[in-house]
Amino acid sequence: MGTVVGETELNRLNNGLSSNNGSSADEGLEHWNPLKKIHSADSSRRRSTSSQLNQPSNYHMHSSLHEEVSVGSSIASPSSRIPDKAISQYYETSPPSSTSSLSSNNQLMNSSVILSPGQFLPDDANAYGPKASLPPSEMPSHFHPLWSKSASKDSNAFNDPSAIPNPSPLFSSAYATRINGSLRNDKWNRSSFSEALSSSRFSRPQVGQQQPLSSAFPFQPVKQPTEQPGSLHPFMQESKTSPFATRRPSLNTDHHGRPILLSPLNYQNSSLNPSTPSPFGGSPVMHPPVSNLSPRTPAVPMSSDGHLAPAFDFLNENPIWSKRFSISSIKYSAPSTSNASNIAPDSAPPASSQFSVPFNAAAENINDTPDSVLANSPTPRHLPYTWSRHSTSGPSRSTVLNPSTSRMSNYTGLESHLAQLSFKRRSNSATLPSLGSIRPFPISEHSPNINPLDEAAVEDEVKEEKSRFHLGHRRSSTADNGTLSSNVPLYPAYNSSPVQTRTSLFSSRLSKPSNPIVSSVSQANAPKNALHSMPSPTSLANLPSNLSDTQYKKLYNLYLVEFKAGRADVFYIDDNIKLSLNLNDYVVVDADRGQDLGRLIAQNLSQSEVASHIEKIPSDRNGQLQNLDGAILEGDTSQSLHPKRILRKAQPHEVDQLIQKTQDEAQALLVCQAKVRQRKLPMEVLDGEYQWDRKKLTFYYHAKQRIDFRELVRDLFKVYKTRIWMCAVSGTNMSSPASINASTNQFVL
């Protein structure tokens, strides 16, 4: 900020200097100026021009736009009788002390200053006033809360000496040069209140930032420094001008909205501020100082990473805020070989690595990969970034699935996101997902280009099933008339992955709810109506009793398959499918709107064995059903058996999934028990069972009275997004199928 020193202050200063030792004004000036060598060398020239200095004139001083100096701060200057060369002198790197007088030697530069001709420096004497506090020069600048050292920018410095106008006795300060002959003039900048409290000042030393020159007029050209090859310094070269460059809006700085006095010395070459001829010859006389009422160009504090951005470095380790870089537009250059392992590949991982990771590790991979990449890049700190706020429940859907921020494959990120949506709704008593709880699904060879978002629309699929199925549950049977669906097979015939933990559930959709799903092997070998060649076994208990066991086995070829907790059911194999099975083999069978996996415990059942199994089935197993409104739905109450098909023999990797299925069932049991305690229901949940394709989740409970668990089922459906069945049992012992007394079964679509 520029300041005008009038005649009154100059005369008062002259009188004060003269009264110090009772000598003349020149002697007082000698005492005030520590540069005795330079002053003695020019003493004769000053005396010869002293008569010209008696003319009434104002000495204007210019302040750099980088400095943060209050409006009221000023510095006393010599009177009109003092030569102008003394005014052009500069302070030392430390500002003047508030307790020192004008005759103190620390207010002017010391005697070691070397003046080199051909360069001149603007008058910075007004940068520090007598009332300004003195920062300790011994202390590093970045530890001081108010002062910092930066490189000044000389608006009047030109590499061409011919650019200097013809000097005159009134403007002898044009011969002033940079101190110490250096291309950089380090000086002190006073920080604003917000910058002084910023944590970035204490993280690392603040680097002086160069601001472009501003004009007192809104549309006056602003000089932008440019660096050209072979130049000594970018600020010593000619600068390009922008014809419509104006001041930008100011931030909350000390000079916001206050007038800034600018010396006409800045605009001697400007066409908007014409000059008049000087009565003494030489350089023209400038107009009086102009008051600039526009906001001052703000000095934006620099963050620790070198960006001209708000200093939010204290948020780097904050769990709520994080810095997000735009990776999609980055063109990586060749990194160093030592840190090459930290850089994530741009391409998706191969098919052999499409397996899940824990969600916490997945989130760290998403958040930390951009930072690790940028840390090893040759130019990492010039990239745009934004501050994003985390959700308390984990990364949002757009954060995990956004390809510009995630370095994982779409399938792994999608599965991690779906698992997080499922587990974050659990109660506090439930355990967090383990390593195997988040399972990827293999990409079907028949649909390699299907968008994962289309395949994984679980909620849309559930809504679609509402319109397909009625509330009353009906067991699937081969007696239904209709054409089999020829959709893409649900499971591939062979899977090269030996450690697969979950199969795909999103690639097939039924066109008819009661039609069974045919595997790729059986669908390729079976004719169109092969599965309907068997007589309708709607009620095997009503078959004629005069059939022999051989005829019975030849006609029906029934098998008994056991599932969890001793639950068993009767199945058959189509005669047109050549499938050789042995006892204790694991088979994939038709189940309730899906597929299940069980162990073969009996084959070629005789009529007596079937009758014995029918007697163990409770009469109300398929009887009373409740819908969501609690209404009783009448069903088939007779003791009948509806066998289903055995699709194929289970693969080894499918059998390995039973271990993970058991772990998921244990977690589901904990969640259900926590929900029961939360709602204070008088019931005891004994066990939980997943259907092998995860399309159905059954909870076995024991209660002494009728339980209204509709709200409980809704809560469980929000967590698992699958059909929930509540099956009542007679007691805590579930070792045999006879112990199951399914008095109430409820499901949710």
Curated annotation (Swiss-Prot):
Feature: compositional bias, Polar residues: 149-159, 238-252, 265-275, 388-405
GO molecular function: mRNA binding
Composition skew (Low complexity), residue ranges: 13-24
Stretches assigned to the PSP1 C-terminal domain: 644-729
Protein origin, superkingdom: Eukaryota
UniProt-listed PROSITE patterns: PSP1_C
Region of interest called Disordered, as start-end residue ranges on this chain: 1-58, 124-170, 200-291, 385-405
Coiled coil ranges: none
A Pfam family annotated for this UniProt entry: PSP1
GO cellular component, one term: cytoplasm
Stored NCBIfam families: RicT_YaaT_fam
Name assigned to this protein: Uncharacterized protein PB7E8.02
Species for this entry: Schizosaccharomyces pombe (strain 972 / ATCC 24843) (Fission yeast)
